Amino acid sequence: TTLLRMINRMIEPSAGRVRINGTDTAQLPPHLLRRGIGYVIQGHGLFPHRTVAENIAVVPRLLGWKTARIADRVDELLELVQLDPATFRDRRPHELSGGQQQRVGVARALAARPDILLMDEPFGALDLLTRERAQADLQRIRLELGTTVVLITHDLAEATSLADRVAVMDRGRILQVATPETLMRRPVSDFVAALIGGTERPFRLLALCPVSKLREPGNAGGPPISATASLHAAL
């Protein structure tokens, strides 16, 4: 959480620098910096007295967008997170499921088209099934929009399934930054190796490889397996 807040300057670093696209963020006015950064917290953080549309529209209203543009953006984002605008636009947070609340939280963070999305354990409060759907939604949105996502999680499986690069931290220090596969194959310390787990490591590696990479031509019996499924799922 402290690391995320240093990225958007809610906390100023006591040493070192934070750079975005090579620019030292300390040289930018904080309010201008934050306009390019969305923030999703654990438990969604929606305003309970406002509708879904009003929650999503918070930042665009602060930026002075016209009403019609805001309405169009709200509907666009609800469709992006796969919530029907006509059904959900006027609901309040207590009328939504946990997964729906989290989707609205993501939509709100994306409202002003930020280049970076900060997510602080966004799925920690969700049940397993809802969490898996939310992770799939995030991956789809990230690929569709090209947004850079910095996500904090204590779940290694979540990190390796979602991330292009994983940074392992302990006591406020980054121990290793690597692709999920490199992290699994070459942990740099006993702490990282223990985090991965000795008996779990082969299965975590299988989860990173799609079936399509090892598929061979020919016929086979049994139920079909999706080419995009992981080898772990196939096993």
Task: Write out the residue ranges for each language-model feature.
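Conserved ABC ATPase signature
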Residues: 92-96, 100
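Conserved ABC ATPase "signature" region
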Residues: 68-87
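Helix-to-loop junction immediately C-terminal to a conserved catalytic motif
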Residues: 8
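ABC ATPase "signature
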Residues: 177-178, 186
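Conserved catalytic motifs of ABC-family nucleotide-binding domains
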Residues: 113
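Conserved ABC transporter NBD signature motif
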Residues: 16-24, 33
